Amino acid sequence: MIGSTLSTPIHAIEYEQNSQKLIANPMIRMIAACARNRVMGINGTLPWKIERDWEHFLETTRDGVMIMGRRCYEDFVEHARNRKVIALSRNPNHHFAYAQRADCLSGALEMASSMGKNTWICGGEEIYREAMPLCEELHLTQIDASFEGDAFFPSWEEHFPNEVSRREMNFDGYPLAFLVFKK
């Protein structure tokens, strides 16, 4: 209807093309998990094995384009086969079995925008830091425990001051909070 206002936000309008669900104006979101001391990794992998957190990550990112660094991809590769993944590597000779390669975040975001799906920034530390100002939402699993690690989730509070969702539970002996923050 000409002259009418759209009551549904444009980023929520979805349509089918070639039997794939596309989104008219996809969002850039970030997803991460960190411990109380902000640790999120050690030696290129997660320092914990919490099944519910892993299921949450896989379920939340299922229909989107995932952007991650090379080390994160190497830890994720067995799950990448049926997903849209862009792995970052500055090495032009690096090839990924189930992912496209980009040499920088801006190149990866450009590739992702052409796919018509929400984009998920999935780490590591340097990529989170660079992408934080560009993301509209942060989906964060906070684990109420401390772990040894060599990768830390950057401070997000300045970029995402508004908590809009919280689900708390205990799983595998750890108190977890699944949080969603917006700008």
Describe the predicted segments one by one.
Residues 8-11, 23:
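Low-complexity, intrinsically disordered segments with a bias for serine/threonine
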Residues 26-30:
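Extreme N-terminal starter segment of soluble prokaryotic enzymes
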Residues 32-65, 70-183:
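Flexible, gly/pro- and Lys/Arg-enriched active-site loops
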Residues 18-21:
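Polybasic, lysine-rich low-complexity intrinsically disordered segments
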Residues 1-9:
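Extreme N-terminal basic, low-complexity initiation segments
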